[in-house]
């Protein structure tokens, strides 16, 4: 699917919702509007600021304009310079800060108050705490007994599409992107004339947990929005795993269709919502997902 097709899908879904699609320039990475690059090194500089992110550590460059353009075009660690064989102090501090941020988002919990504020039903996997979640991924693939009963009692049965949200390995991915992806996604699915299930939140969930959810609720398509494993400097990336007619015993990873890198610096959440709506419609038409779908 090329950029033009994606933009058409976004316009179509947003139009059906009575909203205006964002201009292409608004969907670009925030780095294009960062502050001008600086070369001075200061311990007082906020390591998370835009100024620190576009800092250039190369001293006396031959073509400063080339470095400036390169630094503005990517969030990668380029143009940081060296102090002999070692990285410069600010470059090292930024590396450590980004590493710390990535660890924090893995270990943080999605606040119960936040889940309640969104009006979501909360269930959990067989995992009871974050440490167990990180060491026993197999238990994160199954719902606890209480969760199974809650879904049977409180969720719509036999939906065309069931949307599930889970913390995964990034709490920030859920809390930061939720408002921009779930409302347009739910509205787009309903505008498409599909029977949409009750969205809910799964604490300590792994990707394969959507198979059990689909089996319990009798959903034709299950869409799981889950926090991605964070990278250095990027802890807000969300993934969508969609699968047609999942079954615990027979569904394999090749049966899933994945849309990753959903965040403001990657695929904008509102754009991803439109693409997911189109994907769900095609899955229902073809009665397939993953490698079994035709382009």
Swiss-Prot record:
Q: Which Pfam families did the record assign? A: EutC
Q: Which UniProt keywords apply?
A: Bacterial microcompartment, Cobalamin, Cobalt, Lyase
| One of the record's GO cellular component terms | ethanolamine degradation polyhedral organelle
Where along this sequence does the record place binding of adenosylcob(III)alamin?
207, 228, 258
Quote the record's cofactor note: Binds between the large and small subunits.
GO terms (molecular function) for this protein are: cobalamin binding; ethanolamine ammonia-lyase activity
Q: Part of which pathway?
A: Amine and polyamine degradation; ethanolamine degradation
Principal localization? other
Locations listed in the record: Bacterial microcompartment
* Cofactors that this protein relies on: adenosylcob(III)alamin
Q: Identify the domain of life.
A: Bacteria
Enzyme Commission number? 4.3.1.7
> Could you give a single Gene Ontology term from the biological process aspect?
ethanolamine catabolic process
- According to its UniProt record, which reaction does this protein catalyse? ethanolamine = acetaldehyde + NH4(+)
Family matches, as InterPro entries:
EutC (IPR009246), EutC_C (IPR042251)
How this chain assembles, per its entry, is: The basic unit is a heterodimer which dimerizes to form tetramers. The heterotetramers trimerize; 6 large subunits form a core ring with 6 small subunits projecting outwards.
Per the entry, what this protein does is:
Catalyzes the deamination of various vicinal amino-alcohols to oxo compounds. Allows this organism to utilize ethanolamine as the sole source of nitrogen and carbon in the presence of external vitamin B12.
- Name the family the entry cites: Belongs to the EutC family.
PANTHER family cross-referenced by the UniProt entry = ETHANOLAMINE AMMONIA-LYASE LIGHT CHAIN, ETHANOLAMINE AMMONIA-LYASE SMALL SUBUNIT
The protein here is known as Ethanolamine ammonia-lyase small subunit
Organism, as annotated: Escherichia coli O157:H7
């Amino acid at each position: 699917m090329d950029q033009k097709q994606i933009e058409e899908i976004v316009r179509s879904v947003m139009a059906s919702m009575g909203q205006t699609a964002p201009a292409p320039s608004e969907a670009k990475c925030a780095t294009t509007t960062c502050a001008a690059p600086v070369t001075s090194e200061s311990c007082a500089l906020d390591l998370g600021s835009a100024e620190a992110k576009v800092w250039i550590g190369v001293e006396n460059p031959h073509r400063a304009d080339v470095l400036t353009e390169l630094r503005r075009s990517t969030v990668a660690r380029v143009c940081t310079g060296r102090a002999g064989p070692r990285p410069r102090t600010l470059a090292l501090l930024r590396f450590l800060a980004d590493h710390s941020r990535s660890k924090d988002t893995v270990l943080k919990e999605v606040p119960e108050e936040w889940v309640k504020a969104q009006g979501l039903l909360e269930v959990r996997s067989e995992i009871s705490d974050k440490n167990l979640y990180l060491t026993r991924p197999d238990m994160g693939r199954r719902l606890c007994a209480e969760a199974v009963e809650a879904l049977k009692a409180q969720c719509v049965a036999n939906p065309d599409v069931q949307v599930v949200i889970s913390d995964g390995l990034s709490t920030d991915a859920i809390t930061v992107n939720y408002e921009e992806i779930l409302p347009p996604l739910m509205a787009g699915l309903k505008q498409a004339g599909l029977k949409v299930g009750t969205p809910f939140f799964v604490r300590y969930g792994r990707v394969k947990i959507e198979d059990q959810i689909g089996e319990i609720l009798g959903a034709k398509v299950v869409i799981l929005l889950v926090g991605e494993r964070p990278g250095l400097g990027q802890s807000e990336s969300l993934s969508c795993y969609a699968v047609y007619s999942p079954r615990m015993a027979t569904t394999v990873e090749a049966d899933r269709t994945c849309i990753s890198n959903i965040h403001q610096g990657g695929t904008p959440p509102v754009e991803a919502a439109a693409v997911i709506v189109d994907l769900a419609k095609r899955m229902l038409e073809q009665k397939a997902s993953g490698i079994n779908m035709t382009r």
